[in-house]
């Protein structure tokens, strides 16, 4: 079986606080992996590590078979799209402008890709409306669109339905299923809401106080 993400004894400490304690998980290619735990259990810390935003204290992880302690890990990380903690969007920009900005950051020609991405996440009719006037669900979908701008194989979502109303939750759920089933994207979802993950996940990891 091919694994998109593997962690082996992964550990993260802050002074005297151990947030991740010898964590070992395996995320198969093509899976929707639900990473379940209460707030403060270490879910976001793991995501920040695999996205390269922080360094582990001990252990290792691999993305598409490339270990984090090799120079090739940067190439593997380019296959990840992520929404960490909150959507990385510019509130004074429209949805289209946000996606264009991400294309510029990535150095990708943007003209042909903006509208397909907007249609994919259901924001094609937002026009000149700025993101600051979007609902929370719309902002979350825009954040996912921005994460998809680099055409990733692996999508990492940190609490994607947190704070959303029932309709917003359904829209995110349907989008995740579409990305996985129609586009073949492996999805890693952290959440403290097991009931919602049960509607999505093909595989699970349960974390408590840094332990699986």
Regions picked out by a protein language model, each given a short descriptive name:
Residues 59-69, 75-76:
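Conserved ABC transporter NBD signature motif
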Residues 155-159:
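Catalytic Walker B motif of ABC-type/P-loop ATPase nucleotide-binding domains
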Residues 38-42:
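Walker A (P-loop) phosphate-binding loop of ABC-type ATPase nucleotide-binding domains
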Residues 51:
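Helix-to-loop junction immediately C-terminal to a conserved catalytic motif
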Residues 100, 104, 109-126:
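Conserved ABC ATPase "signature" region
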Residues 170-183:
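Helical segment within the ABC ATPase nucleotide-binding domain
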């Amino acid at each position: 079986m091919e694994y998109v993400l593997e962690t082996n004894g992964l550990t993260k400490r802050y002074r005297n606080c151990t947030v991740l304690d010898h964590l070992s998980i395996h995320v198969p290619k093509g899976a929707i992996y639900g990473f379940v735990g209460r707030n403060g259990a270490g879910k976001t810390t793991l995501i920040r590590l695999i996205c390269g935003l922080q360094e582990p204290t001990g252990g290792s992880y691999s993305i598409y078979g490339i270990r984090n302690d090799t120079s090739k890990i940067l190439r593997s990380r380019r296959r990840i799209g992520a929404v960490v903690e909150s959507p990385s969007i510019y509130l004074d920009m429209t949805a289209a402008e946000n996606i264009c900005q991400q294309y510029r950051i990535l150095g990708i020609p943007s003209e042909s890709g903006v509208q397909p991405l907007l249609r994919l996440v259901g924001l094609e009719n937002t026009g000149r409306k700025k993101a600051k006037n979007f609902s929370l669900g719309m902002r979350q979908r825009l954040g996912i669109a921005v994460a998809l701008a680099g055409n990733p194989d692996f999508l990492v979502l940190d609490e994607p339905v947190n704070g959303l109303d029932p309709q917003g939750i359904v829209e995110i759920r349907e989008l995740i299923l579409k990305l996985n089933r129609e586009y073949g994207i492996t999805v890693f979802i952290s959440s403290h809401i097991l009931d919602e993950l049960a509607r999505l996940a093909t595989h699970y990891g349960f974390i408590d106080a840094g332990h699986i």
